[in-house]
């Protein structure tokens, strides 16, 4: 039997993020106490109308009760709005705390394990948790805690009315649990297949030039459509089940209120309760069962959040937070490679074995070999994105993992075999996505890459906006901008993977 992955470390991180807001959750609970106590306003108002106002025919009493009731309902609305706002901000705060952690974990995990599905949906999974807090579901769960209290209040009116409310509530809760059990599997399958279809669609759009040029549109659509159709079928199955249960629960709740009125009317005829009690019991039962119906309508949100939390816990467990590192001094660029062995991600076979060399400042090393010989693998090991399977890569005596990753990145210039630009201006791309690029450093890097004059000829120069696919730029122009990005900040170690590809002469 396959061993289940350990998600406890990641789940502990998620619980810690939520634990920071326990005080606010307690305040939501306190608001819920007053909101649900104020839910008794309607039944008590009806009791007073039937048993006091109509009996005394006092207009003054009616006006006073109506004004008091309006004030109480206004207070309930304010408190209900306040707790919804607090819950929404708790969700936003949890997302804000975990955003950087999840982003970094997904980035590093995807580098070493490209096929891991948790990396493709990490940010959306975190958003699903945030949406759970912003949805009406959590307020409904707080209100469901008061369902037994309302049922007990109905018992005070008359035991027969109380037992009817308890029996009806039990049926609704059982239907809700059965709905959750039956819809969870198709809903999960629909989510998984939908994510796979989205990945295929993104890949097809990214390679649209090749797809159109080689007449692959039909085949590409068929691959996407196969996944999409299966996901849609499972989604419809889950929606049909949820719709059936939702309609049944809504209809049954309306029937229960009518049954409560019918039973109450019979008890009135027997002289055991008053007309006010009959109406108040019906209203109170509606208040007691409304959270169950609301939770039922929002159950899909809960399922998405639950699945998202499981995937996030798995991702965070597989990529724990890095330990704190001592800030090392700026290196002088002495590179030592000692018996280096490199394996590709998700592979146990070594691409390079027992490589050793030393480079001092000012020295260069060219690596020549056929395709698949491991040149790019060596480059990735030298910049630290592929950890060595054996041996060491040292920069000024320290292994690369002893440096802070962001600090190490500023010391290194890297031009990959396939250069990619990011959405933004050319200056921002050269400045490695800095929000406020250093103009002098940007121009200096472009001049060193022989890209300055080419950039000035573009419509907006360094402020020309480009897309992730390059847009109007040729392969050679993208290559030169990538080289300028590698040279930005005067790095101490420059690693270039086929730097002259796409360049004329």
Residue ranges and their predicted role:
Residues 1-39, 55, 59-64, 83, ...:
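Membrane-integrated ABC transporters
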Residues 15, 19-23, 111-112, 125-133, ...:
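An intracellular "coupling" helix at the cytosolic face of ABC transporter transmembrane type-1 domains
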Residues 25-82, 86, 155-160, 271-275:
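Transmembrane helix-loop-helix hairpins at lipid-water interfaces of multipass membrane proteins
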Residues 32, 65-72, 139-189, 262-273, ...:
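Transmembrane helices of ABC transporter permease
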Residues 68-80, 168-171, 242, 246-253, ...:
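Hydrophobic alpha-helical segments in the permease module
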Residues 88, 216, 240, 288-315:
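Cytosolic ends of transmembrane helices, especially the final helix of ABC transmembrane type-1 domains
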Residues 383:
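Helix-to-loop junction immediately C-terminal to a conserved catalytic motif
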Residues 394, 427-468:
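ABC ATPase nucleotide-binding domain helical subdomain, centered on the C-loop/LSGGQ "ABC signature"
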